[in-house]
Amino acid sequence: MIGGIKLRIMYSILNILYTNKAQSKLYALTQKDIEEALIADGEKWCERTVYNKIRALVKQGYVKEGLKKSNSNTFYLTSEGIEWMKEVEGDIENE
């Protein structure tokens, strides 16, 4: 079971990738892009927290690294990530 705050930021990151159609190596977002989108959504997290959560999502297979953008790594949503988002949304609707 993932804790509430950890779950929220991980879901938010996946949702940002989903809404920005970052679903392939070519169409992927940098960590900075993700941080800016989080801020635009009213969520402010430190760079290290966002970095750690992205790494956790990569490790779980929900996110993969895309093609580099300048010197920055990019990230995109996998089909497993989309399925996990649907599961979380289903859990929330059932509460």
Where are these regions (language model features)?
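A short, conserved structural fragment
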Residues: 58-68
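Minor-groove-contacting beta-hairpin "wing" of winged helix-turn-helix DNA-binding domains
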Residues: 70-77
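Short acidic, hydrophobic short linear motifs in intrinsically disordered regions
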Residues: 24-38
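Short, amphipathic alpha-helical interaction segments positioned at domain boundaries
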Residues: 79-95
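Short amphipathic alpha-helical interaction segments
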Residues: 44-59
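Short alpha-helical segments that sit at the start of domains
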Residues: 1-26
